[in-house]
């Protein structure tokens, strides 16, 4: 297995809901420790820059968020089932009957099942009703709250994520796993760093935390950085299986998505046009999107007068327990970022 495939598998499988991204941070630090200076902060934002800084050179920020949508233990019921709340944007019907990992007080991952009232005990009205988080519990197989606390070592405030180990389908060049929003972007940041260690720019890279609950990690990290431009990788939701053809803007295997607008930011139009033109020049497929919803770390960086673009890698079924993404889209996203960094210069950036 080559290093790229292993990197994607490892980042996808890593435990890292918003607020508990430690495992992802450790993966990143280990990955680039030979080429970068690395450190983190108390929020577990991970900072990476090349050991040989170039004085008076352009500084480019590469970012992806380390967290995934997950859950947190809210309360333990007397019968041993667990009430929980979502971390990030979930549709509750997508998680019923799924397995989760609960990181207990000893740092062990305990398996549990997202349970709802069995159909045998539901009235006709409830069978057709809306599923809400208040209707769901996590069941670890315990029969009392005491057992949950003393035998499973599970407490209020423990973090959870879907129990999914990423798989690679070599024949079709696709990945099936969890947390591609934005672990596929985390892997891309690592790949770009490995390809650009000799580039004539200063590269700052971050894996920021708590994006799924309000871009809190980037709001902290950006105050420690002073880039001239920023590229934010995202695992963007693919729309090709439910939109009309003319509205499809992030299809699987059609290239990375460059986003003009979402509810958190308007892109730097001159930087965006530069990236699109360069992609066409290099025969790098890209898709362009305008979104009425959504929000990313770019919504933070551009407020600090930093021209920013989003390079999105399409993910089918983002914010669910399982997603699908394409190796081809990943490769083209990495290639585009590398080409931008290799070709851009200070004069061009001043024009943004």
Which functions belong to the PLM regions below?
Residues 1-352:
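N-terminal hydrophobic/helix-forming segments and targeting peptides
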């Amino acid at each position: 297995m080559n290093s790229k495939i292993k990197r994607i598998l490892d980042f996808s499988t890593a435990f890292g809901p918003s607020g508990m991204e430690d495992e992802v941070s450790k993966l990143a630090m280990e990955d680039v420790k030979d080429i970068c200076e690395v450190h983190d902060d108390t929020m577990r934002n991970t900072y990476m820059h090349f050991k040989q800084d170039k004085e008076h050179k352009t500084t480019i920020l590469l970012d992806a968020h380390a967290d995934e949508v997950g859950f947190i233990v809210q309360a333990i019921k007397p019968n041993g089932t667990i009430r929980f709340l979502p971390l990030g944007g979930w549709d509750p019907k997508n998680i019923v009957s799924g397995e989760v990992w609960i990181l207990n007080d000893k740092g062990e991952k305990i398996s549990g099942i997202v349970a709802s009232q069995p159909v045998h005990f539901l009235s006709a009205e409830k069978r057709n009703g809306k599923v809400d988080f208040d209707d769901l519990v996590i069941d670890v197989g315990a029969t009392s709250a005491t057992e949950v606390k003393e035998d499973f070592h599970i407490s209020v405030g423990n973090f959870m994520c879907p129990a999914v180990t990423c798989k690679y389908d070599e024949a079709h060049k696709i990945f099936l796993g969890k947390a591609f929003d934005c672990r596929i972007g985390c892997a891309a940041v690592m790949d770009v760093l490995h390809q650009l260690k000799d580039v004539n720019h200063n590269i700052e890279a971050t894996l920021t935390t708590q994006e799924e609950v309000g871009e809190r990690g980037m709001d902290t990290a950006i105050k420690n950085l002073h880039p001239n431009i920023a590229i934010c990788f995202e695992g963007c939701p693919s729309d090709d299986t439910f939109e009309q053809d003319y509205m499809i803007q992030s299809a699987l295997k059609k290239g990375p998505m460059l986003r003009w607008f979402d509810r958190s930011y308007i892109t730097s139009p001159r930087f965006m046009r530069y990236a699109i033109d360069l992609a066409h020049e290099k025969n790098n497929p890209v898709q362009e999107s305008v979104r009425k919803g959504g929000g990313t770390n770019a919504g933070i960086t551009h407020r600090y007068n930093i021209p920013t673009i989003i390079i999105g890698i399409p993910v089918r079924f983002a914010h669910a327990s399982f997603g699908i993404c394409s190796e081809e889209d990943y490769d083209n996203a990495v290639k585009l970022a590398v080409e931008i960094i290799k070709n851009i210069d200070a004069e061009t950036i001043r024009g943004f």
